[in-house]
């Protein structure tokens, strides 16, 4: 016989432990359904499309969360060993400096307290303050504070060592992340993790694994395809930039197509970020080699001039101020000011778009992307922070919706195994003997075409790389990813025995 429990007249103390759980689960389902029914009646077609799209993504996300990625445990041990050796070298060098100059014999670089004592008491450097987790304005030794102090000649070698050791410590922490019993690392992707529609990721649903969306290039080679499979990493090219161009076109093409299309035309005509590099660094030896090769010259902490210039372009698109952008890009502030004058002179539609966003905030309080994703903004419309957030929102949401539309296409076709989404890229694996067929098909499947105003077609192009591990190929990583140019004649050098899988 079924026991009926009327929760409206329930004496909770009269229930057994099992009955308490039953009531809790029943309320959890019934109340949620009642709320859904009320909310569902209020959803318009714009919101419903976004809701249905998010629901459709649950299946590929669950599959990716469950599958995880195989780890080359031999490679992982080798990378850990190399990073530990680098750590010992930097620690020894740092202690030589501290003992010789400051007669300091014991120092733990990982201790914020000891770092504050060294920098602000022993070295007497200007105290850098910011609000801590408790909201108190207090001395800080975070990266931003240390990079400000590194401009002092006496502090530069000490701070460079501390920053280098912190980077190594963070990398070692990731490399030592426990694996599951099948030798795989997993994450938990969240479809609703951000306001833009981009995914976030964190530890897996059972508490292990980690965020796999911020893994640096130096660590990626430990991720390998399953035996008999090969990786493809497909990356949207200039996604946010082309989104900015599409918005400018839609807003202003009725007034002047040349004005409205100046930025989108530049995006579609070639390598935008190399063009930006030439604008900000005119004194590089342009003409002595291909422009992109010169732009890829290393500039700061493994970052190329092109990567730094890319930050300037994005920062300028998103209302970045010269002083802040100089810190982020490591270009002198005077160069950033000169760059922005040239940049906005070449693409005057961008500052006009910025003004349009402010008008929409003040008069409508919402923005809607060409993909149909709408967001309301509840901050003060005349506040700078709200304006900056709104300016960045639609281009970033367009990139997220474009890659996720492609991911859904790949999953529905059931020809590849999805692994890791990194905001504007997707890593998947496929039977390696099918490469010449799968890669061209996947490039087409990842397209999310739109038709802009005046019937202008718009699609964010995709670059493909293939290989047997997630790192870029090189002398020390022959099985890494290489740009796909119609075929890949390489043969895998590491077997499953060498991978440490058996």
Residue ranges with predicted function:
Residues 120, 243-246, 472-477:
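Short acidic, glycine/serine/threonine-rich loops at helix termini
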Residues 427-431:
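Short hydrophobic/aromatic beta-strand micro-patches
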Residues 188-296:
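Function-dense linear segments that define catalytic or interfacial modules
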Residues 1-218, 224-230, 237-240, 322, ...:
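Conserved "right-hand" nucleotidyltransferase catalytic core of DNA-directed polymerases
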Residues 28, 240, 269, 273, ...:
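Hydrophobic (often cysteine-bearing) scaffold residues that line and stabilize catalytic clefts
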Residues 448-461:
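Flexible helix-coil linker/hinge segments at domain or subdomain boundaries
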């Amino acid at each position: 016989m079924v026991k009926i429990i009327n929760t409206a007249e329930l004496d909770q103390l009269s229930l057994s432990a099992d009955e308490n759980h039953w009531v809790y689960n029943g309320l959890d389902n019934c109340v949620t359904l009642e709320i859904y029914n009320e909310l569902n009646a209020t959803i318009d077609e714009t919101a419903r499309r976004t809701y249905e799209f998010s629901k459709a993504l649950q299946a590929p996300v669950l599959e990716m969360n469950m599958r995880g990625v195989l780890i080359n445990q031999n490679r992982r041990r080798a990378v850990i060993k190399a990073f530990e050796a680098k750590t010992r070298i930097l620690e020894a060098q740092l202690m030589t400096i501290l003992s010789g100059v400051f007669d300091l014999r014991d120092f733990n670089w990982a201790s914020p307290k000891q770092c504050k004592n060294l920098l602000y008491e022993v070295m007497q450097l200007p105290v850098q303050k910011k609000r801590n987790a408790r909201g108190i304005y207090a001395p800080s030794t975070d990266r931003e504070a240390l990079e400000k102090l590194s401009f002092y000649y006496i502090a530069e070698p000490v701070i460079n060592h501390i920053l280098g050791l912190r980077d190594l410590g963070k990398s070692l922490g990731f490399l030592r992340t426990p694996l599951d019993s099948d030798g795989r690392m997993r994450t938990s992707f969240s479809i609703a993790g951000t306001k833009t529609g981009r995914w976030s990721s964190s530890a897996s649903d059972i508490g292990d694994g980690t965020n796999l969306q911020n893994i640096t290039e130096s660590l990626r080679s430990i991720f390998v395809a399953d035996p008999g499979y090969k990786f493809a990493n497909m990356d949207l090219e200039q996604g946010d930039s082309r989104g900015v161009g599409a918005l400018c076109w839609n807003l202003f093409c009725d007034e002047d197509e040349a004005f409205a299309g100046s930025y989108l035309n530049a995006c579609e005509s070639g390598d935008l970020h190399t063009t930006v590099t030439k604008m900000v660094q005119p004194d590089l030896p342009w003409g002595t080699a291909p422009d992109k090769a010169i732009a890829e010259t290393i500039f700061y902490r493994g970052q190329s001039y092109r990567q730094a210039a890319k930050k300037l372009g994005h920062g300028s698109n998103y209302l970045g101020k010269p002083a802040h952008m100089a810190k982020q890009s490591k270009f002198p502030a005077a160069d950033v000011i000169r760059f922005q004058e040239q940049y906005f002179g070449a693409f005057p539609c961008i500052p006009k778009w910025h003004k349009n966003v402010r008008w929409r905030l003040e008069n409508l309080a919402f923005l809607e992307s060409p993909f149909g994703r709408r967001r309301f903004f509840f901050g003060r419309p005349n506040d700078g922070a709200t304006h900056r957030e709104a300016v960045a929102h639609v281009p970033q949401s367009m990139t997220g919706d474009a890659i996720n539309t492609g991911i859904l296409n790949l999953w529905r076709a059931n020809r590849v195994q999805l692994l890791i989404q990194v905001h504007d890229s997707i890593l998947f694996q496929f039977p390696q003997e099918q490469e010449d067929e799968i890669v061209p098909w996947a490039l087409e499947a990842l397209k999310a075409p739109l038709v802009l105003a005046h019937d202008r077609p718009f699609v964010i192009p995709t670059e493909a790389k293939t290989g047997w591990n997630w790192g870029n190929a090189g002398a020390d990583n022959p099985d890494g990813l290489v740009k796909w140019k119609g075929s890949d004649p390489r043969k895998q050098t590491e077997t499953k025995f060498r991978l440490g899988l058996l």
